[in-house]
Curated annotation (Swiss-Prot):
Cysteine disulfide partners in this protein: none
This protein's record includes keyword Hydrolase: yes
Annotated keywords: Cilium biogenesis/degradation, Hydrolase, Phosphoprotein, Protein phosphatase
The protein, known as: Protein tyrosine phosphatase domain-containing protein 1
Post-translational modification Phosphoserine, affected residues: 435, 437
This enzyme's EC code(s): 3.1.3.-
Function: May play roles in cilia formation and/or maintenance.
SUPFAM superfamilies: (Phosphotyrosine protein) phosphatases II
Domain of life: Eukaryota
Secretion signal, residue range per the UniProt entry: none
Pfam families: DSPc
Active site per the UniProt annotation: 234
Molecular-function GO term, any one: protein tyrosine phosphatase activity
Length: 796
């Protein structure tokens, strides 16, 4: 049994013996080579040695830009430098890198003469508008500020903030000399004295920042965009600047990383330069996924978390006033309680609307233009006879061969997938203006008359596989043939943003000329300041969702009961979109009396979900007609889940729909403010509490509360801050409903205890848990009612 180990133990001995003989025989040669290398190293400078090390550490395949691996990965955005170039930029001394890459004192990025007018969005600076509100630019200098009146240009463009991503003393050998006071090529005080906010985030050149640091930058950028337009610069305004803007787009619109990179590069060529920077955007996208997850029980699913863990994630995303307000309270708890009180008191949901920049139309327009430009090039190569052989796939293959920004249609597929399903409706209705000037409308009509693709329609939507229809496509992009196929024109008009702002608003009245004025659901003031105000695919229009009239928000006139709203009616071509087009091109309208009809009027196609919504919405006018006391009792019954109106199964379906919305779309936080059914709101809130990994009040907490039950008024303060504030938020909502029947209050407390503890009354320790917490909760309600009576204060 011991023989095999002995034979194996001899192997290392023999191996070391032969290795030793081999090394001893070659020792003189090794010493000679080392001597030659050391003598050569003395001649070379340390920087040259670093360059040689960088070169030698890169394989031949990595040095070859035509490597087959790179060709296979051409479907995704690729770095602008080779691996050799990236490593050299990290080892070459700063002054050498400046002279080689930028031009040294004659730095091309700081020389306006090197760039065309199109490359100078702000004259005198190499700059580009990535969106209508975000300017990417090279660093300015004191000389440039004075020579080209940059600050005056900033004012004329509405730029209110400048974000500097450089470190003091960086690129000292490039362009104009650095200012001794600041370490930059300009003095920040020059901007601040002009009323322009200045932010500085030190970020190493060609490097990346930590994900939490980037998230902080993005939140600051979000806040700055609420004040006005933002200018961002590093040195050239390409690498670090592009990364920050791409991360902002990911944060604000839920774009994928590659979509954001493609979009930024389309507006600012050569942005996001290194592999590390590309990886940074992709990792930031993954970093946000669990932070955005609210309901772990539905798609997109994630691991369940405790209340404390959720509050930590929430703090990462919130900022400003909202972050301070909701430091220890889950947003969904606070919002549902507030909405419930607003419904009970028949108050308007929102009091103020912030001036919000919208990104959705810009993104759609840019992507559409990127595709259209390539289609135009392809169509110009073929005459009408050759159009039969033209297919979208062939164009996409040609895109890849040309190595253009949009290398494949699949890269942007997630961005358009939902819109294709939903008839390509425009996005972000809550964030875009609902009234347009005459020039806007004329420009919209001219786009349709010229056969050009509108902002919200991707060019692929007009492509088809029928060769005869493809001839119509060629004419669609030809200025000589402005005539459109009527079905296509109907599609275009139905998807154009000017005709589709009826989802979230109800008509307030009519202008003298008969045009519609829409009411708009607004955002609560405390939520406005810190929300991401540029949603992308999150606010896509769903033609199946109805417009629920809210009589509480319609101004009462002398004949308010006879107010009319215009309902879009389909008359031809089987169209049933939000606004159908008659043969004369005018939008068909007919008045509908909302007051006399027991059912709510809706716009657009009715899907399975909207059918249910219409049934629920039919009760809304009835709720608004109830007295204040009746509405308060109804809200309390909703908290207790004493549902007497809608079927529980239907409420469950709607709750599941809201769970998915809140998980996948930022705009859901605004849309939920339009939910008027208190039973749906309360069921949504309790479902969130019950899906936590651990109950809000754990078994250990209960043991502690049972021991301290004698002092019921102070018992809740023994819990953690998050537990205490979450429970108090719900109890404050109950107090704000004022006087409600005792049996209803008992039912509300029982429902709250069940949700907070995940314990049923008929379980083993159920009676002890319920009696203990009911005593504590009732004592807390008494104290709060006494405080409210002495010092009345508004709701949550």
């Amino acid at each position: 049994m011991q023989d095999p180990p002995r034979r194996l133990s001899a192997v290392p001995f023999l191996s070391s013996f032969f290795e030793g003989r081999r090394h001893s025989a070659s020792d003189p040669i090794l010493r000679l080579q080392q001597g030659r290398r050391s003598s050569a190293a003395k001649v070379l400078s340390s920087s040259s040695l670093q360059v040689m090390v960088a070169m030698s550490s890169v394989s031949c395949a990595e040095r070859n830009p035509t490597c087959p691996e790179r060709k296979r990965n051409s479907g995704r955005p690729t770095p602008k430098y080779t691996k050799v170039g990236e490593r050299l930029r990290h080892v070459i001394p700063g002054h050498v890198a400046c002279s080689m890459a930028c031009g040294g004192k004659a730095c091309k990025y700081e020389n306006a003469a090197r760039w065309s007018e199109q490359e100078q969005a702000v004259k005198g600076i190499y700059s580009s508008w990535v969106t209508d509100n975000i300017l990417a630019m090279a660093r300015p200098s004191t000389e440039v500020l004075e020579k080209f009146c940059i600050i005056e240009q900033f004012r004329s463009h509405g730029i209110k903030s400048i974000i500097n991503l450089q470190r003091p003393g960086e690129h000292a050998s490039c362009g104009n000399p650095l200012e001794q006071e600041s370490g930059f090529t300009y003095l920040p005080e020059a901007f601040m004295e002009a009323g322009i906010y200045f932010y500085n985030f030190g970020w190493k050149d060609y490097g990346v920042a930590s994900l939490t640091t980037i998230l902080d930058m993005v939140k600051v950028m979000t806040f700055a965009l609420q004040e006005g337009k933002v200018a961002i610069h590093c040195h050239a305004g390409l690498g670090r600047t592009g990364v920050l803007i791409a991360c902002y787009l990911v944060f604000a619109t839920r774009m994928t990383a590659d979509q954001a990179i493609i979009f930024v590069r389309a507006k600012r060529p050569n942005s996001i330069q290194t592999r590390g920077q590309l990886l940074c955007v992709r990792e930031f996208t993954q970093f946000l996924i669990p932070l955005r997850n609210i309901f772990s029980c539905c798609d997109p699913k994630a691991h369940a978390v405790t209340l404390a863990q959720y509050l930590i994630r929430q703090r990462h995303l919130l900022h400003g006033y909202e972050a301070r307000l909701l430091k220890h309270i889950p947003k969904i708890i606070h919002l549902v309680c507030k909405l419930l009180l607003d419904l009970a008191e028949n108050r308007p949901v929102v009091t103020e609307v912030a001036d919000i920049p919208g990104l959705s139309a810009e993104i759609e327009k840019t992507v559409s233009e990127m595709i259209t430009r390539q289609l135009d090039k392809e169509l110009l190569r073929h005459d009408s006879d050759a159009s039969d052989s033209f297919t979208p796939t062939a164009v996409v293959m040609d895109f890849e061969n040309q190595d253009v920004v949009l290398s494949s249609e699949q890269e942007l597929d997630p961005l358009w997938k939902r819109r294709n399903v939903e008839c390509l409706q425009p996005l972000a209705h809550l964030k875009r203006q609902l009234s347009y000037s005459d020039s806007d409308l004329k420009r919209a009509e001219s786009l349709l008359e010229q056969g050009r693709t509108p902002w919200t329609v991707p060019a692929q939507a007009l492509l088809c596989h029928n060769p005869r229809q493809q001839k119509h496509i060629s004419r669609c992009y030809s200025p000589q043939s402005p005539q459109l196929d009527l079905n296509k024109e109907t599609l275009v008009r139905n998807t154009f943003s000017f005709w589709n702002h009826t989802k979230f608003g109800v008509p307030e009245g009519l202008k003298d000329d008969g045009s519609l004025i829409f009411h708009r659901t607004s955002i609560p003031k405390e939520v406005q300041r810190s929300r991401t105000f540029s949603s992308g695919i999150s606010d896509s229009y769903n033609p199946g969702e109805p417009v629920t009239p809210n009589s509480a928000n319609i101004p009462k006139g002398p004949n308010s009961s006879q107010q009319k709203v215009y309902h879009c009616e389909c008359e031809s071509h089987g169209g049933c979109g939000p606004s159908s087009v008659a043969e004369d091109g005018e939008t068909c309208r007919r008045p509908v009396d909302c007051g006399s009809s027991p059912k709510a009027q809706f716009l657009g196609n009715e899907t399975q979900n909207s059918k249910y919504l219409s049934e629920v919405a039919a009760h809304m006018p009835l709720q608004s007609e109830l007295s204040v006391e009746a509405r308060r009792i109804l809200a309390a019954k909703a908290l207790a889940n004493l549902n007497e109106i809608a079927e529980k199964e239907e409420v469950k379906k709607k709750v599941e729909m809201w769970q998915k919305e809140l998980n996948s779309r930022d705009g859901a936080w605004e849309r939920i403010c339009g939910e008027k059914d208190p039973f749906i709101l309360c069921s949504l809130m309790w479902s969130w509490v019950e899906q936590l990994k651990e109950p809000v009040i754990t078994k250990e907490d209960m043991d502690m509360l049972v021991d301290r039950c004698a002092d019921a008024s102070e018992a809740l303060f023994l819990l953690e801050k998050g537990q205490q504030q979450t429970i108090l938020c719900v109890l404050h909502c109950i107090v704000s409903l004022q006087t409600i029947p005792a049996d209803v209050e008992e039912a509300v407390l029982a429902r709250a205890i069940k949700a907070f503890t995940k314990v049923n009354f008929d379980s083993e320790n159920g009676p002890i848990v319920y009696n203990t917490l009911k005593k504590i909760f009732k004592r807390t309600l008494e104290e709060k009612r006494k405080m409210t009576k002495d010092n009345p204060e508004p709701g949550i």
